[in-house]
Amino acid sequence: WGGLIGLRLVAAQPDRFARVVIGNTGLPTGHGPASDAFLKWQHFSQTTPVFPVGTLVTRACVNPLTDDVAAAYDAPFPDDSFKAGARIFPALVPTSPEDPESSANQQAWRSLELYDRPFLCAFSDSDPVTAGGDAPFLAKVPGAQGREHPTMVGGGHFLQEDLGPELAAKIRDFITETA
């Protein structure tokens, strides 16, 4: 949920950020169609009787997680009553301009369209939910212009799990190049 939370924070307080790295995220306003994969995820999150966080994270990865890592994703939630936040987040993603969060995301985009500090997109090649989600950032954010943006080959949605060391190296290089 870094896009919906973090990018709105960058937009609200841009001077606090020397540079930004995003991966497999978005800041939708509901003006374009949501992907079928996202709509299915959104529906599932609201209707499934059981919400197995560790299993869901595992399924969104290309490489299988160990049982210990999957259990760590479940650990903050002793039972389903603790998962209200995790369940509601997908429903807060605007899929039409009338959605309550649409105007806040539109306002954030107006700020990001002026953000000229270094901005790196590192999206994976195997995430059906955010595939192509880097395009609006590459087109609209001035700080994203004129630099190479890596495609993280072999990564699913959770890059930190599938390609953690490779992603860390890209971020390290980006920081070094823009320091």
Task: Label every model-predicted segment.
Residues 73, 86, 112, 121-124, ...:
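Generic structural signal for small/hydrophobic residues in well-ordered secondary structure
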Residues 2, 6:
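Gly/Ala-rich beta-loop-alpha elbow adjacent to hydrolase catalytic centers
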Residues 7, 11, 16-53:
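Flexible "cap/lid" loop of the alpha/beta hydrolase fold
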Residues 8, 55, 72, 88, ...:
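Alpha-helical elements of Rossmann-like donor-binding domains used by nucleotide-donor carbohydrate transfer enzymes
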Residues 119-155:
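Conserved loop-alpha-helix segment in the C-terminal half of the alpha/beta-hydrolase fold
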Residues 145-179:
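Catalytic active-site module of serine/aspartate enzymes centered on a nucleophile-bearing elbow/loop
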Residues 31-36, 41, 84-87, 132-135, ...:
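Short aromatic-enriched loop/helix-cap "lid" or pocket-rim segments at secondary-structure transitions
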Residues 30-33, 50-106, 110-112:
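Conserved alpha/beta-hydrolase catalytic His-Asp/Glu region
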